[in-house]
A protein has these predicted regions:
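Beta-strand-rich domains and repeat architectures in extracellular enzymes and scaffolds
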Residues: 19-52
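Beta-rich, blade/repeat-based domains predominating
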Residues: 25-36, 78-97, 101, 138-157, ...
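Beta-propeller domains
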Residues: 40-73, 109-111, 124-125
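Conserved beta-strand positions in repeat-built beta-propeller and related beta-rich domains
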Residues: 41-48, 100-104, 111, 158-162, ...
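Blade-loop segments of beta-propeller domains
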Residues: 60-99, 103-107, 112, 131-139
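Beta-propeller fold detector
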Residues: 63-73, 130-134, 177-192, 244-260, ...
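Asp-box/WD-like beta-propeller blade repeats and closely related beta-sheet repeat scaffolds
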Residues: 106-155, 159
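Short loop/turn segments immediately following beta-strands, especially the blade-tip
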Residues: 172-176, 237-248, 348-352
Length: 353
């Protein structure tokens, strides 16, 4: 990895402490996970690059497919149960595991291939697949885009950014079920567009890009799951209610509470003290929301253009910058990506260690 000070293509003055940890021309990474001195990155197939789906960073710009080459070698006709079709998120748990969220669809907005949507846990001690959790057709629906994951006890919670809803996964039994399907709390609202470089991000048909249930965090005490569409606002619900399959859909919906009115965010990370770090897309900034609701800017810089899912590790916050809005999909087939793709890290206060 490199450790150089950040410098933007528009020659903006780089903030003190913002370090380029790695850069590449082979991947458009939107996710990062850190295990000691090992740094993993991942990116979606629909971004249109030929690098691995998940990689271990080796040196300044080397990328080693992880956990091996075969899992990163999906092609049409491949066994979708033993390859990564489209990785949208990676997440390190508290038990030496690296979780991989595979949407199962090689195209943006497409339906998951049969049997392809899954959550995969890799044992970081052995670098081998520990367990595969299939997300079957009753969970990953046509149009689903299983987005991200968080944990509490024997359960995991996932967001579906395509077919608005949450997924509750029993880590012991492997059973998964959908909750809050189509509820307002998980549905992208109108009137809160994603704005980058002063313009609304639009789909090829000209309609504004709308991303349903996307970011989520579990409170440090495990009591609440915080969640929302990418556009905001955020809601919360008690995890004990989500964990109970006997709770009715109407009772769950009635227990959703408003939590925080945040702008469109690329990604979030929650510190042990309850501080929520989030990337403010429109302002190319990393901000934080204190437990009392106060919001302040941590660092702002043009190079932080669409920072996606950050990670807290070793006193740093790691910031992958995929520049998703600059992909050809959103510009009539023309790429606006400014190469190389970068991963930054920024030193935080002690409470984020």
């Amino acid at each position: 990895m490199t450790g150089t000070q950040a410098q933007s293509s528009d020659n903006a003055q780089q903030p003190d402490g913002l370090i380029i940890a790695a850069e590449t021309r082979r991947m458009i990474w939107n996710a990062v996970a850190v295990d000691g001195d090992r740094v993993f990155v991942a990116g979606p197939r629909w971004a249109g690059v030929n690098g691995p789906a998940i990689a271990l960073i080796d040196g300044k710009d080397g990328l080693i497919p992880y956990p091996d080459a075969s899992w990163n070698a999906w092609q049409p006709g491949s066994d979708v149960t033993k390859t990564f079709v489209n990785v949208n998120a990676i997440r390190r748990d508290d038990h030496n595991g690296l979780w991989v969220i595979d949407t199962g669809s090689p195209t943006f907005g497409g339906d998951p291939l049969p049997g392809a949507a899954k959550a995969v846990r890799i044992d970081l001690a052995t670098n081998r697949i520990g367990r595969i959790y299939p997300l079957g057709p009753r969970v990953a629906l046509p149009g689903s885009y299983v987005d991200d994951i968080r944990f509490h006890g024997d359960h995991a919670y996932l967001t579906d950014a395509g077919r608005a809803g949450l997924i509750v996964l029993d880590l012991r039994s492997g059973e998964a079920r959908r909750v809050l399907d189509g509820a307002p709390s998980v549905t992208a609202p109108t009137g809160r567009p994603i704005v980058m470089d002063g313009e609304i991000v639009r789909m090829p048909d000209g309609s504004p890009l709308r991303v349903n249930s996307d970011p989520l965090e579990v409170s440090p005490d495990g009591r609440y799951l915080y969640f929302g569409s990418l556009h905001g606002p955020w809601s919360r619900i008690e995890t004990r209610l989500l964990d109970d399959p006997g709770i009715s859909a109407s009772e769950l919906a009635s227990n959703v509470e408003a939590w925080a009115d945040l702008p469109p965010v690329g990604g979030t990370a929650m510190a042990p003290d309850g501080t929520l770090y989030f990337t403010d897309l429109a302002n190319e900034a990393l901000k934080k929301r204190a437990p009392d609701g106060t919001i302040t800017t941590v660092v702002q810089y043009p190079g932080l253009h669409w920072v996606d899912a950050p990670a807290l590790a070793g006193g740093f916050i790691w910031l992958p910058v995929p520049q998703l809005d600059r992909l050809p999909l959103f510009h009539k087939g023309t790429s606006k990506v400014v190469w190389p793709i970068r991963l930054y890290r920024y030193k935080l206060d002690a409470q984020a260690n």
